[in-house]
C-alpha cells in the first residue's frame, strides 16, 4: 500500500514562503496540502486560492474552516470558485469551531451538530448544482442555486470532510 503524505500549514510562515512549501510538496509527490484557519490570524481561503494557482496536481484543502462565519451561499460559491482554479483538487474541511473564540466574536454555537448537518447537506446539494430549498434551525434558503452564467455548470467534485 502506498503511503499518503500531506503538508499541514498554519500561520507560522510567511504566505509567500507557503507557496514555495506547497510547490516543493507537490514536486515530492505529496497528496495534499491542508491550510488551517484558526484563531483570528489567517483565513484559509486566500492561501488555498494562491496554492491552487501555482500547482497542478496536489489537492488543496481547508483544515479546517468553521460553519458559523460564512453563510451557506458564500460558502458554496467560495468552494465553487476554488474548484474553478483547481478542478477536482479542492477538499472542504469544515468543523464546528472553538467555543471560546466563537463567544468572543458574538457567535452562540447552540446545537453544533444540527448546525453542521444542515451546512453539509445544503453545501453538497449546491455544489451538485441543484436548486435548493431548505428550512432548518440554522439554514433557511428558498429556491437558491449557484448562479453560474459563464463557465462550468456541471456538478463539482468537492469532498466535504468534517
Which residue stretches match the model-derived regions?
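Generic structural signal for well-ordered secondary structure
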Residues: 18, 41-44, 68, 75, ...
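Structural motif corresponding to the early beta-alpha repeats
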Residues: 61-77
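Active-site-proximal loop/turn and secondary-structure-junction residues that shape catalytic pockets
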Residues: 11-13, 39, 66-68, 96-100, ...
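N-terminal beta1-alpha1-beta2 module of alpha/beta enzyme domains
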Residues: 1-63, 158
Amino acid at each position: 500500500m502506498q503511503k499518503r503524505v500531506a503538508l499541514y500549514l498554519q500561520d507560522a510562515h510567511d504566505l509567500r514562503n507557503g507557496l514555495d512549501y506547497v510547490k516543493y510538496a507537490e514536486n515530492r509527490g505529496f497528496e495534499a496540502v491542508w491550510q488551517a484557519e484558526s484563531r483570528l490570524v489567517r483565513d484559509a481561503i486566500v492561501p488555498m486560492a494562491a496554492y491552487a494557482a501555482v500547482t497542478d496536481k496536489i489537492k488543496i484543502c481547508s483544515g479546517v474552516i468553521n460553519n458559523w462565519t460564512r453563510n451557506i451561499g458564500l460558502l458554496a460559491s467560495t468552494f465553487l470558485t476554488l474548484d474553478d482554479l483547481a478542478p477536482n483538487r479542492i477538499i472542504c474541511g469544515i468543523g464546528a469551531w472553538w467555543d471560546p473564540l466563537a463567544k468572543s466574536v458574538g457567535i452562540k454555537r447552540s446545537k453544533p451538530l444540527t448546525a453542521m448537518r444542515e451546512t453539509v447537506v445544503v453545501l453538497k446539494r449546491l455544489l451538485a448544482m441543484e436548486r435548493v430549498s431548505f428550512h432548518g434551525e440554522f439554514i433557511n434558503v428558498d429556491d437558491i442555486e449557484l448562479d453560474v452564467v459563464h463557465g462550468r455548470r456541471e456538478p463539482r467534485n468537492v469532498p466535504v470532510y468534517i
